[in-house]
Each structure stands twice: as structure tokens, then as C-alpha cells.
């Protein structure tokens, strides 16, 4: 392959998105459109990657540089100060290349999220094989409104491209359209750009006019037709963004299915492009797997589960759970109605049950937190059991502190752990205990006082009530000790 450079056009205003977010930074399948574009071109053996920015450059340029760093590729930024058309944008992009660059220049857009490395590689190979001045991708649309139409000779040769605003009625009837993805000989491109004129309905310098100029100069001009129109579809508004997101999601889902994952209802399952799932895992309806989520084999996920940047081990079950930046060990069970906040790490064969919330907590192998519990800023050892309705009280209004629970600990229901506090290995707590001091290994912690039964209280304080009648029918008396007559005895 000849030396290659890639120019990504990302300077458009994106007004039809009606958004404060730059168009190319809108996301689908867990990546911005610009990220999709850079991932596609990063797979090419291109010497130079250039992103042309204009409006919102203070947000788009740093994003491009960060994505490039993630991909291990240097990205050069070129600035289009004035919006004078696509031809002018490419001119700006060429300023970021060495003046003596003579290879192939690939031009694509930052709002074509499904374009892939394979399609671009084929374009470059076809272009180089014919020593062409210009090679462009085309596709056929049932409704070509808004796209440039491909003009051909009777024998099929490409004459040029006419934009929608400049097309005649007969030209608008053409359904083969320009995909706005090109490969150019650098010399031919520079020469043609220097001769562009803004004598058109938009008053802009059209990159598409380069095709006709290159042909008139005697250069070879070729077109490669793409049957899969979604690969080269652009995004101008949120409707198109949602449409392409659905197409991409369906392809991602099918890829996992073909790799051995059972997805019960593809229509209600959304999976980001960077998610990995092991074989024989079952994904149930209403599930969203987002970000860099990684799921092992033989797991069960869902229904109605959202996991973002979560690692799930082999054989785990995660049911009706919302999790972010968490780790779930092999053969663990989570849910239903469990909330895993960042920093949660559940060991193998553990359990986080119904209405449990965890945050910044490490929970050891075989440990169970079965019901109605908040575990925040905590370390729990192995094979412990946390009773229902327990709370790890980690915040005093100013500082968050940690609680440490040992291994083989059993805590009663409604235990409150007031951090910072440590419960030693093998210790127990009674129901309703408020643990304010460290509990030694093997000890039983009990903070509640003895129970007092004030007999006859209902008959005296709620005479005539249904409760009093039921008590009387059960043989309850009205007498009570004198010391139990005061308001402190009755809670009144």
C-alpha cells in the first residue's frame, strides 16, 4: 500500500441536532460518532490521521486527541475557521500534512458511525490498484433526498457528482448517491482544490467538484458501490442517530449470538460495541450492557438489568440489577432489585439480594447480603452473613469512614455499623444492635436493652378501639403497675 493519510471532517455546525453537544460527540453503542470514525481509520496503515474541526473546536479537538491516545495513534488537528464548504475543509486538513506528501489521501466524515476498517481498506486497495486520481464510495437509496447524485456516462464511467441543491429534476431522480467517502491521489487533490469555485446554490467550495476536475485533467476516476447503505449513512438529526443506533445494535447482538450467546429478545436488548460476553451466557429481555462491561461464560443476565463497566464472572446470575463500575465474582447471585455503585467487588459464590445497595465495598468469597441492606465504604471477609435491614453508617456529615467485617461473621437483622468500626472474625451481633465500638473475634455484640411489656396499656389508652376489643376477647386485663402509668411508660 502507498503511504496514506486520513482526513476526517468534523467541523460542521450540526444545527439540525438542536443540541449543545457537538454533533460528532453524540453517542451510539457506547462511543461518540467521532470515536467510531477514529476507530475505523485507526485500523488502516495510514501514516497521518487528521481531524478537521471548526465550530465547538474547544470540545471536539480534545476529544479527538483523547481518542487517538486511547488507540495509540497520533492525531493532528486542523482548524477550519470559516464554514466555506467541504472542499475548503479538506484544504484545511491538508495543511496538517507534510508539504511533500505524495501518497493516498482518504477523506471521510466524523458523522458516519457504521463505516468500518474493512470497507476503507477495500477502497484504498482498489484506488491504489488503478493508480486512480480519485475513487469514491457510492450507494443506492430509495429516497436519495439531500444526497449528491452520481453522474455517469452511458458505459458506466463516473462523470461527477451533483449536489441536491444544484440538481435538475432528472438528476434528482437518480438513486445512486455519493457516500462522501473518498480516496484521492494527493497531487491530484491539491491541484483540483486550488481550482474550486463557489459558483453554486450554496455559495460553497464543494469537495464533490474535485471528481469532475480530476476527470477533465485526464485522471482515472472510479466508484465503488456499497450495497449496505447503513455502512456509509450519515447523521444529521436525532432521528437518523436513533435509526443507525438500532441498526448497529442489531449487528452487535447478532455478533454475540453467532459467538454462542443466547439473547432471548434482541429487540429489547442493547449492547455497546466494547462489551464482551462469554459462551453459553443467557441474556434476558430488557437488558442493557454498556461501556466496557465484560461477562464470563454460563452467566445469566436479566431480565431488566443495566450494567455499565461491570465485570461479571463465569456462572454468575444478575437479575433486575443496576450496576456501574463493579465486579461480580464467579457463581455469585445478584438481585433482584439490587443497586451496585462504583467500587463494589463481590467475591465468588457471594450473594447480594433484594433491595441491597452497595458502594465502594469489597465483599468476600461466599459472603451473603440477602435483603434490604446498604453496604457503603466497607470490607467484608469470606463466608459472612449480613442480616436483613442492616446499614453501614459511613457518613457523619463531614467524613466518610470504612467498616471492616471479618470472615464467618453473622449479624442480626437491623444491625447498624457506625463507621469507623471493626467486627472480628467469627463474631455475632444481635438483632437491632448499633455497633459503635470494635467487636472482638468470636464475641456477641448486643446493644439493645431488655424488653419491657406494659400490660393493659391498650385497654387503658385506647378504650373502645378494635385493638382493645381484641385484647379483651383474648383475656387481657386492664391492670398495670403504678410505675407504668406515666407518659414515659406509654411513649406519650
From Swiss-Prot:
Required cofactor(s): Mg(2+)
UniProt-annotated binding residues for Mg(2+): 111, 236
Region of interest: Pyrophosphorylase: 1-238
UniProt biased composition (Low complexity): 469-483
InterPro entries documented for this protein: Bifunctional_GlmU (IPR005882), GlmU-like (IPR050065), GlmU_C_LbH (IPR038009), MobA-like_NTP_Trfase (IPR025877), Nucleotide-diphossugar_trans (IPR029044), Trimer_LpxA-like_sf (IPR011004)
Keywords of this entry: Acyltransferase, Cell shape, Cell wall biogenesis/degradation, Cytoplasm, Magnesium, Metal-binding, Multifunctional enzyme, Nucleotidyltransferase, Peptidoglycan synthesis, Repeat, Transferase
GO biological process, one term: cell wall organization
Residues engaged in binding UDP-N-acetyl-alpha-D-glucosamine: 9-12, 23, 80, 85-86, 148, 163, 178, 236, 341, 359, 374, 385
Region called N-acetyltransferase, residue ranges: 260-492
Keyword Repeat: yes
UniProt entry tagged with the keyword Transferase: yes
Cofactor: binding comment: Binds 1 Mg(2+) ion per subunit.
Subunit (UniProt): Homotrimer.
Family of this protein: In the N-terminal section; belongs to the N-acetylglucosamine-1-phosphate uridyltransferase family.
Annotated protein name in UniProt: Bifunctional protein GlmU
Name of the gene encoding the protein in the UniProt record: glmU
